[in-house]
Each structure stands twice: as C-alpha cells, then as structure tokens.
Amino acid sequence: MKLLTGLVFCSLVLSVSSRSFFSFLGEAFDGARDMWRAYSDMREANYIGSDKYFHARGNYDAAKRGPGGAWAAEVISNARENIQRLTGRGAEDSLADQAANKWGRSGRDPNHFRPAGLPEKY
C-alpha cells in the first residue's frame, strides 16, 4: 500500500509524464531485483563480515538503474533495517548497515566493504 501511495504521490505532485512514470516503475522493479540478487548472494556466500559489502552492492546496483532504482533501494533498505530493529537487532549494527546502504546508493564503490577472502564470484 505504501508503494502504491508513493507512486501516486510521485505522479501527481511531481507531474511526472506517463512515459517517465513507466520508466520510473521499470527502474524500481529492476532495482528491487538487484537488491534481491545481493541478498541471495549474501545468503549463498554465508561469509562472516560480508554483510556490509552486500548491502552496499545491492544499493549500488539498484541506484545505477536510475531514480526509480535508487528509490526502491532506499525503501527496501529502510524497511529491512526497521524490521530488524524491531526484532531486537542492535541499533549500532543497523546504523552501520544504513551507512553501507547510503554508500552504495551514492555511487561509491561497494568493494570498500568487501572482506578479504570473499570469493571472486561475488
């Protein structure tokens, strides 16, 4: 519901043309896929200390898609961190995750967070 409300707000208030609106939706969809791929890779790698790298990489890949991808990355990242905070995960770790998320969304190299020894596949 929040996604729909956000999209309606963007289209009405910002007077987005139908062409750019559908472009935004496509970017958001592709960005969400990038985030899912990073999450899946993180689970598959199961490598200690790599979570910040995968946070940054997912946000980086999504933001490269354009404004829709960056928006999707921010919404997904914030939702994930809020859910984890509610389930008792530490605030300090959540802040570090958010810093990695912002790093990636800003277009900076996610390899900054890459731990030594993480297989090249990732």
Curated annotation (Swiss-Prot):
Localization annotation: Secreted
Any GO BP annotation: acute-phase response
Residue ranges of the region described as Disordered: 88-122
Subunit and partners: Apolipoprotein of the HDL complex.
Associated clinical condition: Reactive, secondary amyloidosis is characterized by the extracellular accumulation in various tissues of the SAA2 protein. These deposits are highly insoluble and resistant to proteolysis; they disrupt tissue structure and compromise function.
Keywords for this protein: Acute phase, Amyloid, Amyloidosis, HDL, Secreted, Signal
Protein family according to the UniProt entry: Belongs to the SAA family.
Source lineage: Eukaryota, Metazoa, Chordata, Craniata, Vertebrata
Domain of life the protein comes from: Eukaryota
Function, in words: Major acute phase reactant.
Designated gene of the protein: SAA2
Free-text tissue specificity from the UniProt record: Expressed by the liver; secreted in plasma.
Protein name from the UniProt record: Serum amyloid A-2 protein
